[in-house]
Amino acid sequence: MPKRTKILDKNQLQQKVNRLAWQIYERNHMESEIVVVGIQNRGVELAKRISKVISSISDIKVIVATVSIDKDNPYDSDLVFNLTETDIENKVVVLVDDVLNSGKTLMYASSEFLTVPLVKLSIVVLVNRNHNRYPIKADYAKEI
């Protein structure tokens, strides 16, 4: 197995997570509740970290949810959420993934929210590669 290149150390990663959490809080400080939805696998871990920071800096109730998607063939399988539509209805939803590359995964995952009335849908990524082939953008991103 080839050796993986380490992009961020633990402290650098936490700095990026802290900044993302603060940005989300700053734009949603008037909300009483935020739903943070992580895309399996690494998006879920990032969502949990961001949620933990938001909870530590504010009184906003943060609900962490997950969505499972086949990233290689998203159109061939259904998305699997661990929340129902009524759990996210009329709330701020923050969709989280580790990397925005072509935009296919985030486009497919975000399409599920189009039939649900939301206060707002935002997208968060740790890395934005800017190779977009789909009309989707990250509202919050940390360039590495």
How should these model regions be labeled?
Residues M1-I144:
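PRPP-associated nucleotide enzymes
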